Amino acid sequence: MRKTHINVIGAGLAGSEAAYQIAKRGIPVKIYEMRGLKQTPQHKTEKFAELVCSNSLRGAAITNAVGLLKEEMRRLDSVIIKAAEYTQVPAGGALAVDREGFSDFVTREVSNHPLVEVIREEITDIPQDELTIIATGPLTSDSLANKIREFNGADGFYFYDAAAPIIDANSINFDKVYKKSRYDKGEADYINCPMTKEEFQAFQEALISAEEAPLNSFEDLKVFEGCMPIEEMAKRGYKTMLFGPMKPVGLEYPYEYKGPRDGEFRTPYAVVQLRQDNASASLYNIVGFQTHLKWGEQKRVFQMIPGLENAEFVRYGVMHRNSYMDSPNLLKQTFQSRKQENLFFAGQMTGVEGYVESAASGLVAGINAAKLFNDEEVVIFPKTTAIGSLPYYITHTDSKHFQPMNVTFGIVEELDGPRIRDKKERYTKVAERSLNTLTDIISKENLA
């Protein structure tokens, strides 16, 4: 195996993080990105770490599993977390970012590193004799995807991700909406569009009957629950949306609200939330409204939402295939291929789901590729940490029922001793244990 540099294929969240981790350890990196020469169905730019779905990196508190994961990544000097904090926009208790500023930051930090060489080229085969991380994401080009399937000897799985629409803030009718975060956590960063029972019923019926965009050559519809199209939720039953993105709990009308309401009820029957999408607050996305309706149908149906009667859509919701590997059979916890030690995979193609989780996989793969380059022992983060629980889960779960996974406390190893009944107290203890463990690993492995 030649060891003059490490290849990273793909400059998304995982690839960018991996390249950064390798370069900061003094190892030359060649990062290949085809965007700029050839676009995917979902990306709009050639920038690194472009966010194509939501602009939220989810919960910030360490009593939330993804918040704990972000804190672990921060301590491991993650470029993705640095970018997110630098370009943060108001989002209550969540970490949301200005999309363009975020991608600009990552592109600049990675591509300007003196040990990083950026090559705009489509890779169509798997390098055999060089250390390589493949992090081409769920929209891997057909030619490389076929080589990966051929290499792994398995067809893998596939499903669809759906992105929510983005609207112009100036087109919102603020007489019918109010600002509030659920349970008044943090600042009142969300715009809430309340619905009466009659409005909700009409909206659900319109969603069910709306015409969907054709799925082209895509295969069987296998939707990951975390990014389910809103029209699919509507079809699942009357209350599915009320317990999902349109949940009204904790979003009571403010006393100063003068818009339409259901009688004297303090809480709306249903609520559609809008979340700030950029730093200037000129754009808002419709939270949880991923969709693959035809664009004309999106305008017709979503303008039924109170306050959005004249909404101008900056981007309509779109849907794309999202393929991932049979990681339980194909990968080690280090994100190395079981078949070829010098080959790593990272990002959503491994079955981790979400921006933060994808970046975390790139971080682990990057650290271990650097270890391998230097003839050092690779690092296996324990499942008592959030960053260790994900690779453990995707490599140890039942292959027959394997589906993409977000980080949750359910996959982090339980505390020793009697179970603490209070969730917040229990998760606080889990987070403390995790961060203490990580501190020891950082010191022992010289990972800072």
From Swiss-Prot:
HAMAP family: TrmFO. InterPro entries: FAD/NAD-bd_sf, MnmG-rel, MnmG-rel_CS, MnmG_N, TrmFO. The lineage of its organism: Bacteria, Bacillati, Bacillota, Bacilli, Lactobacillales. It is an enzyme of class 2 (transferase). Its EC number is 2.1.1.74. It holds the Pfam family GIDA. It comes from Lactococcus lactis subsp. cremoris (strain SK11). One of its GO terms (cellular component) is cytosol. Its cofactor is FAD. Transmembrane segments: none annotated. It is found in: Cytoplasm. FAD binds at residues 10-15. Belongs to the MnmG family. TrmFO subfamily. This is Methylenetetrahydrofolate--tRNA-(uracil-5-)-methyltransferase TrmFO.
